[in-house]
Amino acid sequence: MLSFCRAPLPPRTHRADESLIIYEDGASSLEFRKSSPEDYLLRNMHPPWDTKKPSIMVPPFHFHIYQTEHFRIVSGSCHLFKDTATKPWKTLSADDPNGVKTASIPPNTYHTINNASTTEPLVIDVSLTPEDVEGEERFFRNFFGYLDDCRKAGQAPSLFQLMVFLNDSDTPLGLPIFPKWLGVAASRAFLQGMGLFGRYVLGYQPSYAEYYREKKMI
């Protein structure tokens, strides 16, 4: 293992026991709730959109290999991008009575979201099916906990660490390669290569005790 070659990890903030986690000095948050067929697992708050300083909550262009991702607007408005990161596919709006309130993205479809407003926060519910409650909570807690700790430490996140998190959740970055089938295949290969190298050569972990408390199996 060549862990001595990797970028230093930031000091980790202990958040494993919090169901509502505050990030970016109060500007954003994640709230985990008990799973049920009628509800969404995750409630996510984004600050107003700032092109010069995007929130850590804005996900990179990505896709899910096996899961469909579902979105439900709670307050504010949200741009949802599908297949292209330059033009919104849909805008979800809580204030427009005739506006779209929910949307779903099937597996192997590039997508991302951002706050459609530059003045108001966005609150949106997120779930994935088929559901993996522990796996999803572990990923979100580690991914955003790490990004926020990097922000506080004033250091750039390690791409290898991010890919270790993403590989553990079967979520490739959407590489801009055409045709689509080739982009999906290349993105999956890039995810596995970077994720495995980051974990088994550089020693990055898919989960840290400060961010996520592993559930005990009975």
Please place each PLM-identified region on the residue numbering.
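Jelly-roll (double-stranded beta-helix
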Residues: 1-68, 72, 79-218
